[in-house]
Amino acid sequence: DPNATIIMLGTGTGIAPFR
């Protein structure tokens, strides 16, 4: 799931852009 990478980036920035 490519979203997994975005989720990792989201947690690092404190947001969830995958939404």
Swiss-Prot record:
One GO molecular-function entry: ferredoxin-NADP+ reductase activity
Compartment list: Plastid, Chloroplast stroma; Plastid, Chloroplast thylakoid membrane
Keyword field: Chloroplast, Electron transport, FAD, Flavoprotein, Membrane, NADP, Oxidoreductase, Photosynthesis, Plastid, Thylakoid, Transport
Pathway per the UniProt entry: Energy metabolism; photosynthesis
Residues binding FAD, per UniProt: T13
A single GO cellular-component term on record: chloroplast thylakoid membrane
This enzyme's EC code(s): 1.18.1.2
UniProt entry tagged with the keyword Phosphoprotein: no
Cofactors demanded by this protein: FAD
Source taxon at top rank: Eukaryota
Enzyme class, broadest EC rank: oxidoreductase
Gene Ontology biological-process entries: photosynthesis
Membrane topology annotation: Peripheral membrane protein
Function: May play a key role in regulating the relative amounts of cyclic and non-cyclic electron flow to meet the demands of the plant for ATP and reducing power.
Stated name of the protein: Ferredoxin--NADP reductase, chloroplastic
Organism: Populus euphratica
